[in-house]
């Protein structure tokens, strides 16, 4: 089951494997021993998108740089303004994190109506998938053997944001998830899905990729994450849960978000915070 409609294919020297379900199921993993100049991760969604969250099972240990390309209807174009928060000491996919990028404003990111048609990437011609925008990820140096990712999706806030609101939050990791739990990434991803659902109910977005700037929704997502965490900690945490809920609703009701209203993957002048929003009483 796809909780977010994200198609994920791993190309191992041109041989495609569909990991769309595994990418959104924490019980499964995806081997990602990318070989430089040969292997790619292809990601398709209905609308352009400028970020993805990687949750790792086994980190890469080799110094390597990740980059992104998108399909413009004719060729793969290099994405610009690429930011990789999975990078640690020059090693991409060394920790959980978000990658962000932007399409080149001089070359549009076009939808591929059918991967079997002319105008579609030849690398995907053995598939038959309709109406998606495709991008691919590659690395400069082959990743270490045994690199494995656990999840690929969206996360609109980070663990340090939770700690800034509740400095004691990490004391609840073991009571919440046992001795093996070391972060709140799964709860952050769930909260991010809740945020998208609530924004959709307000008519502000139609897909997670429409959220172009995290600073618009990161604090709201943090409070929604805290609600989820407190809900399993018993009645003593009911006041904190209520406070988190009130702050969450207040933040989502603010007017002024940067959403991709024209569906081109770019945060343009008319879309930057202040031009899109809704006030709910």
Residue ranges and their predicted role:
Residues 6-7, 16, 37-39, 151-153, ...:
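Generic intrinsically disordered, low-complexity segments enriched for polar/acidic and small residues
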Residues 1-156:
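Signature of Asx- and small-polar-rich beta-strand/turn repeats characteristic
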Residues 7, 77, 95, 105, ...:
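Arginine residue identity/basic-tract feature
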Residues 1-5, 13-15, 73-77, 150-215, ...:
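Conserved short "hinge" loops at termini or chain/domain junctions
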Residues 103-122, 167-179, 206, 210, ...:
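Charged, low-complexity surface segments at secondary-structure and domain boundaries
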Residues 185-258:
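Internal mixed-charge
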